[in-house]
Amino acid sequence: MNLEDLKKRQEKIRNFSIIAHIDHGKSTLADRILEKTETVSSREMQAQLLDSMDLERERGITIKLNAIELNYTAKDGETYIFHLIDTPGHVDFTYEVSRSLAACEGAILVVDAAQGIEAQTLANVYLALDNDLEILPIINKIDLPAADPERVRQEIEDVIGLDASEAVPTSAKAGIGIEEILEQIVEKVPAPTGDVEAPLQALIFDSVYDPYRGVILQVRIVNGVVKPGDTIQMMSNGKTFDVTEVGIFTPKAIGRDYLATGDVGYIAASIKTVADTRVGDTVTLAENPASEPLAGYKQMNPMVFAGIYPIDSNKYNDLREALEKLQLNDASLQFEPETSQALGFGFRCGFLGLLHMDVIQERIEREFNIDLIMTAPSVVYHVNMTDGEMIDVANPSEFPDPTKIATIEEPYVKAQIMVPQEYVGAVMELAQRKRGDFVTMDYIDDNRVNVIYQIPLAEIVFDFFDKLKSSTRGYASFDYEISEYRSSKLVKMDILLNGDKVDALSFIVHKEFAYERGKIIVDKLKKIIPRQQFEVPIQAAIGQKIVARSDIKALRKNVLAKCYGGDVSRKRKLLEKQKAGKKRMKAIGSVEVPQEAFLSVLSMDEDDKK
């Protein structure tokens, strides 16, 4: 491996990712590129090849990023080395997108020829521009009956401000236009800058746990060279490890003699503990370390918190291990142990959003075989106390005594909703019902409107996305970012069963909606909790004040069945005896609460009032 060869090779490297809104054909395009460059034989080819998680295939979304090396012989006769880094399109996985873009020089922007630009397309384009990437717009699905490539070309220029005159019309499904895209990558995406002779600097953009080889780092080499036998050092904590193997993905892992500047591949170095490596950290060589780390990623703060508890309490330690392994390549997942009187031992977890929460729950249940109970999600509130102190509260059961609270502030998001004109009314009505404040509205073209609202995050984590989809027949697209904290009239609502508070059912609610939400919940719980041998009152309370109540009637055995005719006082005596027995039972009996009860707090819905 002489330096000249390495420098020549570096000029032939092109690192790029594909960015798109959900369902605009990103994974299909990646499949076609793999086929065209003959990276994957037709025998191994399957739809959504890079979406290796079952969950990704079933939901038709990309959750984790994937990096792959391809060789392409261009029209100029030269062979180029492409690194394709696949990215998720959903708003909850923006962090994954920003990580993969940091490892690239170019991005292919896929826009659906029928649907045009959507909210998340915009969000991801801005991320790409922040990373100074060369953006190549392409217009996909031109074989659809509703396709209108010219309108979309105009939209790309007007809304994003990119020159779309050379945007390639493609159909990833039919394989049209793939070669033009590959040629554009060669011409327009710059080769990686970086110095082979400089000390090693490699950016960790993902990591996976292998039970035999420990933690395997996925890296982009920015400067220098790394090979088996080297001793690497993590720049964040100074820990050192001996490299056992380096290589690339095609999608299968293939060992190599070295990784040099511009390469995207993996390093295995028998790293045993998950905590020693952090995504966004810089790897360097121990004997000739780089003077400073690369600019990593901005740390993502979780927005939504929920309790996760194993249904079988013996699996508490398994759950901890599962969370640690998921955290390894999902740096945005945070968790800490917590206990609940109702649910026992579990963890309080922080997520980027509801889809993220959903995906983590499903991955734990599938990959680690642990059945879970999740509590209702909540957000982080700033609570200003009367003594001048400010505390952050993410768990409703930790809310301080209301008499000591001066004000409560909640997070608001700037929600950008793109929607066809005929649904604007429905969107505005929904946003207002969710305590949203109108900001602005502009027309993208004759038919589509971009509406911006400020909405409390707590309203969005409930069911905003589902409601938005159903009120616009699925045509709306939605993206949000945290904008500010605002003071709100919020109260903590407790649910009492049989006079006892159930901590896992507590939630924070706006004072205005407290009564109706309390009523909805007690009525729902009444339907869900099975009848007991004794009467069970369900109450919703704010502080000491009960705002709603519903009773589950007791199951009664007919004690009069064998008392034919006879004196009324005899019947009364039997009934009194039954009553006394029930009373005794109530004092010692506890109420079984099924899992649906916790979820019912989640799916509280205005429709339930009807």
Curated annotation (Swiss-Prot):
It comes from Streptococcus suis (strain 05ZYH33). GO terms for biological process: positive regulation of translation. It catalyses: GTP + H2O = GDP + phosphate + H(+). Gene3D superfamilies: 3.30.70.240, Elongation factor 4, C-terminal domain (3.30.70.2570), Elongation Factor G (Translational Gtpase), domain 3 (3.30.70.870), P-loop containing nucleotide triphosphate hydrolases (3.40.50.300), Translation factors (2.40.30.10). It holds the Pfam family EFG_C. Keywords: Cell membrane, GTP-binding, Hydrolase, Membrane, Nucleotide-binding, Protein biosynthesis. It is found in: Cell membrane. This is Elongation factor 4. Its main location: membrane. HAMAP family: LepA. GTP binds at residues 23-28, 140-143. Residues 11-193 form the tr-type G domain. It is a peripheral membrane protein. PROSITE patterns: G_TR_1 (PS00301), G_TR_2 (PS51722). The keyword Protein biosynthesis applies. GO terms for cellular component: plasma membrane. It comes from the Bacteria. Belongs to the TRAFAC class translation factor GTPase superfamily. Classic translation factor GTPase family. LepA subfamily. InterPro entries: EF-4, EFG_II, EFG_III/V, EFG_V-like, EFTu-like_2, G_TR_CS, LepA_C_sf, LepA_CTD. Its EC number is 3.6.5.n1. Required for accurate and efficient protein synthesis under certain stress conditions. May act as a fidelity factor of the translation reaction, by catalyzing a one-codon backward translocation of tRNAs on improperly translocated ribosomes. Back-translocation proceeds from a post-translocation (POST) complex to a pre-translocation (PRE) complex, thus giving elongation factor G a second chance to translocate the tRNAs correctly. Binds to ribosomes in a GTP-dependent manner. GO terms for molecular function: GTP binding; GTPase activity; ribosome binding; translation elongation factor activity.
